[in-house]
A protein has these predicted regions:
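Active-site environment of non-heme Fe oxygenases that use a 2-His-1-carboxylate facial triad
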Residues: 1-53, 58-59, 65-71, 79-80, ...
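Short glycine-centered, acidic/aromatic-flanked micro-motifs in structured strand/loop junctions
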Residues: 75
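Non-catalytic, well-ordered alpha-helical scaffold segments
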Residues: 87, 91, 147-150
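A short alpha->loop->secondary-structure connector
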Residues: 90-100
Length: 308
């Protein structure tokens, strides 16, 4: 492997004309993007068009597990193509370091468009990927029994201003809590107690506010190390008022205060940039923005590398 950083190895990546042609043929033969994905042989595609990516992908996984727990890849050429082709290329790349998983259990959608959604039904509460407000650092898929280990965010159209990615290492949050000693007497509940995580309405089967779905899980465990999303827990307490106790509220406050104090990195994604995170150990968020055209693509991946 050349003597340069893993991130920079992707900066010279080119997309062969033959690769784009194959993707377009597959899309034309399918009724939908998701159906096209099911028809496509990603393994053969990568071996033929991007044979160098397998070894680079393995090196990236090692960095996610032993380094800073996130990697920023710059200037990928995927955003130069029409959106369906761009989504295909991002998905193909994602298979190099994990197994892409559906956005929710009863769907085959592997690529989620992160963009402000207009004309929402009355009373519908948008999830964080559907609005433009500030988003506190959180765990992706916190409301799933088994959150995916890796999350990739690819910038197709970044916001003109705002919309910056914020990253906090979960290990530093736990170190801060441990340093408090008796001042954080309720913090043991973060690992020994169960907290309610309500599934966002966008990811429920009925997509109705009056038919909620939730799980109960600890905030701190061995796998994932941290599971946290404040708005999801808050709405979970509304579903399970019997466990909305003073002790749980105090434990949650200890965690949230430590999150506020913890160092955070701020990343500005330009068009073509991809942020890859270890979702079990870091929290990621976003600053507010006012550009309705902002578009990111998200792919969640399990730890086992493989193809769809």
């Amino acid at each position: 492997m050349p003597n340069r950083s893993i991130e920079n190895l992707f900066s010279g990546l080119t997309v062969p004309i033959s690769a784009v042609a194959e993707i377009r043929r597959t899309l034309a033969a399918a009724e939908s993007f998701d159906d096209a994905v099911e028809l496509f042989s990603f393994q053969e595609f990568l071996q033929n068009e991007f044979p160098e990516l397998e070894s680079i992908g393995a090196a990236l996984v090692e960095k996610l597990e032993t380094g800073k727990r996130f990697v920023l890849l710059k200037d990928l050429p995927f955003a130069d193509f029409e959106l369906p082709v761009c989504k295909f290329l991002v998905l193909a790349l994602a298979t190099c370091w994990g197994r892409p998983r559906p956005t929710y259990e009863f769907s085959n959608r592997l690529v989620w468009e992160v963009k402000p959604v207009k004309d929402l039904p009355p009373g519908y509460v948008p999830t964080v990927t559907e609005h433009a407000q500030d988003v506190e650092p959180h765990t992706d898929s916190s409301f799933k029994q088994h959150p995916e280990r890796y999350v990739a965010l690819f910038a197709v159209r970044p916001a003109r201003s705002g919309g910056l990615s914020t990253i906090v290492d979960g290990r530093t949050i736990l170190e801060q809590i441990a340093s408090l000693g008796e001042e954080a007497s309720h913090s043991a509940l973060l690992s020994s107690g169960l907290f309610p995580f309500r599934r966002p309405t966008a990811f429920t089967r009925t997509r109705r506010e009056d038919q909620p779905d939730w799980i109960e899980a600890p905030v701190v465990s061995s796998l994932p190390l941290v599971r946290y999303r404040y708005d999801v827990i808050e709405r979970g307490f509304q579903c399970l008022p019997d466990i909305d106790t003073h002790e749980r509220r105090q434990a949650l406050k200890v965690f949230r205060d430590a999150l506020t104090r913890a160092p955070r990195e701020v990343v500005r994604l330009a068009a073509g940039d991809l942020l890859l995170t270890n979702n079990h150990e870091i929290l990621h968020g976003r600053t507010a923005f006012d550009d309705g055209n902002r578009l990111l693509l998200r792919v969640r991946m399990d730890v086992d590398r493989g193809l769809i």
